[in-house]
């Protein structure tokens, strides 16, 4: 294993010594916070701001970062460079102050590119599955004692964090296509899990522009780099001839270089075989449910093969994978006055992701009534994929629909949850329930849940906090039961 001497890098590149303090506007996001954490471990002074406290903010504070709640121009005092997330508007006072003071302002992906510049980078892109695939790759490399640096968009449960500074040359990271900033990255291996219409405002509302951007992402690889792509995705299959780089394919497709077969699932695990060119087949036991996660695992296997990681390390990492926060995360049973229900939480916020969650839940618990509480994310996404959302959400037995999490967007008429409720009601005859705010969701769930139900909370907004509330409620119920037994 090749060790990285960070001090030597700074000596070799004197310009890096000029950067003393790095300020992050929107530091509480998983991607921004992850980069900040790695830089903190590299020895940089970190400051930042966000609109609210969260676990990422608290963790960074524990590492010595100075973090402000709320955005004010004075927050950037002392910064050598300012990093902004995609959620930051052009009129943000810290951004304006940095521009006025002529402090360099860079986007998240540009800073990630700097981290990747001196490392063997693996960049994972695609509309869906980025976080899980990146986590699986990081877990395999860790199991193989390669000690990678990683930056992931979700909490890797086994590490207790979404970012880590490793001491090897490997950097494994998500490549965010939402603002096309992933084009800043120059990795050695690029993964594309799938390509669907999303973030279309970035791409002029033109799917061809989105496809062209993914081709450019692959072509940013050096001529000796490798593209790892899913052959099951029809769009990717169409684009492969344009990549002009060594390409390894994976999937259930008969022609895939890393091919999945004999898939089966039992509750929260799955089993399948993986066939590889000029190598024996592997029998994989994956500690995740769903065919979509089998595809994510196949991508991770294909990447690991590029670095000659042994089959034992691959199999062991996948078998013992401890999961990711808010990715089909199971909280076990919780109790209401009407009985016990199983609670599962998921971050997916695109119709395809919601469909994958529903399919995995149905396969794991085929006899249970499926109750979903869903929070749409962004008005533009709801507008652009309205018909798909209406179709997918109508498949659950009982739907509770929270209003759209705006993520800084202005409301769009007809692209809201009340409209979705009406459409689903008219087309399916089902009765979705509109929920005015996440705060009232636990009480509403308590009124409609029956004994034996499966409850899915889903979305990329603040609905995740509801799960914590339900878990705390369950803990209090158990404490009261114990107290009554003692008396």
Swiss-Prot record:
GO terms for molecular function: ATP binding; UDP-N-acetylmuramate-L-alanine ligase activity. GO terms for biological process: cell division; cell wall organization; peptidoglycan biosynthetic process; regulation of cell shape. Keywords: ATP-binding, Cell cycle, Cell division, Cell shape, Cell wall biogenesis/degradation, Cytoplasm, Ligase, Nucleotide-binding, Peptidoglycan synthesis. ATP binds at residues 126-132. It is found in: Cytoplasm. Coiled coil: none annotated. NCBIfam families: murC. This is UDP-N-acetylmuramate--L-alanine ligase. The lineage of its organism: Bacteria, Pseudomonadati, Pseudomonadota, Gammaproteobacteria, Alteromonadales. The gene is murC.
């Amino acid at each position: 294993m090749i060790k990285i001497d960070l001090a030597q890098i700074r000596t070799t590149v004197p310009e890096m010594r000029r950067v003393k303090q790095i300020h992050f506007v929107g530091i509480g996001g998983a991607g921004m916070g992850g980069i900040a954490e790695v830089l903190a471990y590299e020895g940089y002074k970190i400051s930042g701001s966000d609109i609210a406290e969260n676990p990422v903010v608290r963790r960074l504070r524990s590492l010595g970062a100075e973090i402000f709640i709320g955005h004010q121009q004075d927050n950037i005092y002392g910064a050598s460079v300012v990093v902004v997330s995609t959620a930051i508007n052009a009129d943000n006072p810290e951004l304006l102050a940095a521009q006025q003071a002529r402090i360099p302002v860079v986007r998240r992906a540009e800073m990630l590119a700097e981290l990747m510049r001196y490392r063997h980078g693996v960049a994972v892109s695609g509309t869906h599955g980025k976080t899980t695939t990146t986590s699986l790759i990081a877990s395999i490399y860790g199991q193989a004692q390669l000690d990678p640096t990683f930056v992931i968009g979700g909490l890797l449960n086994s590490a207790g964090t979404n970012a880590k500074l490793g001491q090897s040359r490997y950097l494994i990271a998500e490549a965010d296509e939402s603002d096309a900033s992933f084009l800043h990255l120059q990795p050695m291996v690029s993964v594309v899990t799938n390509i669907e219409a999303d973030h279309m405002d970035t791409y002029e509302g033109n799917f061809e522009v989105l496809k062209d951007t993914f081709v450019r992402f692959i072509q940013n690889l050096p001529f000796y780099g490798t593209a790892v792509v899913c052959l099951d995705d029809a769009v990717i299959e169409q684009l492969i001839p344009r990549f002009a780089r060594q390409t390894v394919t994976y999937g259930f497709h008969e022609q895939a270089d890393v091919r999945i077969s004999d898939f089966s699932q039992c509750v929260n695990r799955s089993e399948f075989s993986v066939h590889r060119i000029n190598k024996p087949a592997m029998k994989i036991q994956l500690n995740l449910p769903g065919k979509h996660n089998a595809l994510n695992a196949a991508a991770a296997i294909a990447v690991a093969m590029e670095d000659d990681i042994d089959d034992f390390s691959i199999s062991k990492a996948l078998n013992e994978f401890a999961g990711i926060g808010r990715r089909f995360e199971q909280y076990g049973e919780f109790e209401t006055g009407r009985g016990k229900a199983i609670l599962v939480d998921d971050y997916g916020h695109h119709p395809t992701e919601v469909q994958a969650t529903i399919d995995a839940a149905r396969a794991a618990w085929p006899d249970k009534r499926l109750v979903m509480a869903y929070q749409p994310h962004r008005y533009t996404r709801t507008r652009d994929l309205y018909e798909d959302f209406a179709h997918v959400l109508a498949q659950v037995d009982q739907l509770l629909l929270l209003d759209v999490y705006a993520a800084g967007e202005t409301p769009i008429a007809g692209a809201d949850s009340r409209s979705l409720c009406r459409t689903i009601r008219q087309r399916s005859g089902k009765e979705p329930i509109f929920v005015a705010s996440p705060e009232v969701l636990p009480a509403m769930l308590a009124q409609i849940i029956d004994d034996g139900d499966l409850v899915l909370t889903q979305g990329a907004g603040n609905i995740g906090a509801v799960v914590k509330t339900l878990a705390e409620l369950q803990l209090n119920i158990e404490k009261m039961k114990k107290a009554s037994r003692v008396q």
